[in-house]
Design a protein with these regions (language model features):
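Polar, enzyme-active/binding microenvironments
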Residues: 1-168
């Protein structure tokens, strides 16, 4: 799968893509434009990178699709965002939360993004796993850093068992 987050103080913006084969890392095709703190959805050969910030720019709504070697610009998010979570696939993804702290969620259908049910707890810098119809999000900065975990059933979010320790 593909994933990425950088919630530390900016040390530079990167356009690098790396592939992991279970044993070692290799470099893939660079993204068009250096960014940080966006979110990813999908697999190594069919992935999305959405949101983030770039040098001297505010949050972006840009979405880029990866085919295993190169990136292509596709339909933008409705709300520019950063420090959010991404789940799902290249044709059925979620972009979850935003910074500054927000509960907003959008679903992607392979062409365009649509706003769907908001999280119960607004936050940023959270983790997320799953599909567009069955996802979990956990932790994050509400503030303060939270233990909250929520499950998505394709329609709405439900609070479920919390993390033992607050994390972001």
């Amino acid at each position: 799968s593909i994933s990425g987050v950088n919630d530390s103080p900016p040390v530079g913006y990167v356009a690098d893509t790396f592939h992991y084969n279970g044993t070692s890392w290799s470099e893939g095709g660079d993204t068009p434009g250096a960014r940080q703190s966006g979110a990813a959805s999908g697999l190594l050969t069919a992935a999305l990178w959405h949101g983030g910030t770039g040098p001297g720019s505010p949050n972006t709504a840009a979405t880029k699709q990866y085919n295993g070697s190169s990136w292509t610009e596709v339909g933008n998010l409705n709300t520019a965002r950063t420090s959010h979570a991404g789940t799902g696939t290249v044709t059925a993804a979620l972009a979850i939360a935003n910074s500054p702290v927000a509960a907003i969620v959008e679903a992607y259908d392979g062409t365009s993004w649509t706003e769907v049910g908001d999280l119960n707890t607004a936050r940023d810098s959270l983790g997320g796993v799953g599909t567009q119809t069955s996802s979990l999000v956990f932790g994050g900065n509400a503030p303060p850093v939270t233990v909250n975990t929520e499950a998505w059933d394709g329609t709405s979010w439900t609070e479920v068992n919390n993390l033992a320790t607050a994390r972001r």
